[in-house]
Amino acid sequence: VVRAFLLCALAADHLVLRMHRDIRAHSAAVLARYIVFSKAQLQAPREDWQVAACWGADAACALQELFGAIPSTQYGACRGQGFCIVQLDREGCQFECYLEQTSAAALAPRLAQLIQPGAEHQWQALQIASGIARIEAGTSDQFVPQMLNYDVTGHISFNKGCYTGQEVVARLHYKGTPKRRLYLAGIARADITGQPQ
């Protein structure tokens, strides 16, 4: 896996790739090689949209009240003027909200009334607990999709697409068994000191 991203359609002719900041430049260079064969344009990262995570049992109701509509399926999206909401889980408890800066400023007071603020590390912990592995510069090109459980979580399609290493990935999927996979583990003790190795 060289890079992993979420593709979001902010408009019919405006697609955005959400990925870790430290792989943006390399991803743009790789995509630039292929975009010449299409009628699309690759633009530099834009800072006029913000991403907010929203999670919890009441997240769907709060977003419904705020935006009027929400997606109802995993990786489904609902968009409107200045916003796009993507549902990340099957249960409808994890969402990413893409907000144009003007929309974000206008919605901030109402959002603060409906949703309790959380920290980024809480969202990251939830993503880990959900089995979602993100690719950063240090982990790029270190794993095949099966090692990150992308075949189990629906992050890779075996029916369509063309990507680097497709033959190896498909062979492992149809004829082999991965030697390594991600597993979730936890430690009940809170008094452990030191840095992870």
Segments (PLM) and residue ranges:
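Basic, glycine/lysine-rich polyanion-binding surfaces/domains
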Residues: 1-197
